[in-house]
Amino acid sequence: MEEEGLAIDDVQGRADLRRIDIDRVGIKGIRHPVRVRDRSLGEQHTVARFDMAVSLPHHFKGTHMSRFVEIINGHDREIDIASFEAMLAEMMQRLNAEAGRIEMRFPYFLEKRAPVTGVRSLMDYEVALIGEVSVATTTTWLGVTVPVTSLCPCSKAISERGAHNQRSHVTTAVRMRDFVWIEELIEWVEAEASSPIYGLLKRPDEKYVTEYAYDHPRFVEDLVRGVAARLDTEPRIAAYAVEVENFESIHNHSAYALIERDKRTADA
């Protein structure tokens, strides 16, 4: 039996003689319940997946893995940009790190009404908060992946009947000057697609969505440019990345496009 009060050796704090710095070390895939801001309901309860890591100097053998979990458990409150950056700052302080990164991903649900019948259903979207600290600079991104429908303009133009269409994923990540709702990012993307996607459609709705998409054909280039143009005109957005993947219905590959822009640099 160990003597009461006997100090336990801190193995992680021992020296490592190989003199190799580690860029990132931490934990991945830990799930934790969180509350996030909801434009309609005030807040929404969901479950987030956290990846957390810090840099480790060559003279330390290991980091303190348990502290990452303690930090998450200590933030039992609504997560927004400010509280997320506070979590990032706490991680840097408690791990005594010069650089670090937290990535938090969670499903976010919106109630949508079908375009004709008005029947209600839930749609889920993947949202991400990504924060990085390096050389005393903190960078935070808010991202959301929005599924939409895209219909091919070329297929429509050359075909006597119909046109090929498919589901597309539009992933938009932004750095903000002022607060932007998750719902706004979703709405901006859906407005540029051939058609939004719904959780539930009745026959009149399906007819409407089919014809609406046919009247609004979009190449992958059209879709990525349309979203980028909206973000260019939004003063609350400082920088953005828009990524579009069309899961082609007539090919065994996807079509892809990406636009990245730092408006602060472009406006200088």
UniProtKB/Swiss-Prot annotation:
As recorded in UniProt, coiled-coil segments are none
Q: Which GO terms describe its molecular function?
A: GTP cyclohydrolase I activity
* UniProt-listed InterPro entries: GTP_cyclohydrolase_FolE2, GTP_cyclohydrolase_FolE2/MptA
Which UniProt key words apply to this protein?
Hydrolase
* Record Gene3D superfamilies: Urate Oxidase
Under which pathway is this protein filed? Cofactor biosynthesis; 7,8-dihydroneopterin triphosphate biosynthesis; 7,8-dihydroneopterin triphosphate from GTP: step 1/1
Q: Which reaction does it catalyse?
A: GTP + H2O = 7,8-dihydroneopterin 3'-triphosphate + formate + H(+)
Similarity annotation: Belongs to the GTP cyclohydrolase IV family.
Q: What is this protein identified as? A: GTP cyclohydrolase FolE2
**Organism per entry:** Methylococcus capsulatus (strain ATCC 33009 / NCIMB 11132 / Bath)
